[in-house]
Amino acid sequence: MMFEYALVLSSYLFSMGIYGLITSRNMVRALMCLELILNAVNMNLVTFSDLFDSRQLKGDIFSIFVIAIAAAEAAIGPAIVSSIHRNRKSTRINQSNLLKK
């Protein structure tokens, strides 16, 4: 019973993240949507790991690696966005032509 609830919640999180990535024009919002996608993937990893083999912790350990990648992205992403904002005076995705210079 809890398996279905976890899958529905993670699919909602994943679809909200994909929708936000497609429609957002702000880099900060895109980073937040990327975090939603990574959290949905973590929920799926833990849920399927618990469902198929609760004695082995392969899904749990892999989700810890995904959390570490998300933490690095959360630390580096805003620094890159603030650097782009300082140079371009905008955080809009469609206005940052970094390869043009």
Swiss-Prot record:
It is found in: Plastid, Chloroplast thylakoid membrane. It catalyses: a plastoquinone + NADH + (n+1) H(+)(in) = a plastoquinol + NAD(+) + n H(+)(out); a plastoquinone + NADPH + (n+1) H(+)(in) = a plastoquinol + NADP(+) + n H(+)(out). One of its GO terms (molecular function) is quinone binding. Keywords: Chloroplast, Membrane, NAD, NADP, Plastid, Plastoquinone, Quinone, Thylakoid, Translocase, Transmembrane, Transmembrane helix, Transport. Gene3D superfamilies: 1.10.287.3510. InterPro entries: NADH_UbQ_OxRdtase_chain4L/K (IPR001133), NUOK/Mnh_C1-like (IPR039428). It is a multi-pass membrane protein. One of its GO terms (cellular component) is chloroplast thylakoid membrane. Its EC number is 7.1.1.-. Pfam families: Oxidored_q2. GO terms for biological process: ATP synthesis coupled electron transport; photosynthesis, light reaction. Coiled coil: none annotated. The chain crosses the membrane at residues 2-22, 32-52, 61-81. NDH is composed of at least 16 different subunits, 5 of which are encoded in the nucleus. Belongs to the complex I subunit 4L family. NDH shuttles electrons from NAD(P)H:plastoquinone, via FMN and iron-sulfur (Fe-S) centers, to quinones in the photosynthetic chain and possibly in a chloroplast respiratory chain. The immediate electron acceptor for the enzyme in this species is believed to be plastoquinone. Couples the redox reaction to proton translocation, and thus conserves the redox energy in a proton gradient. This is NAD(P)H-quinone oxidoreductase subunit 4L, chloroplastic. It comes from Amborella trichopoda. The gene is ndhE.
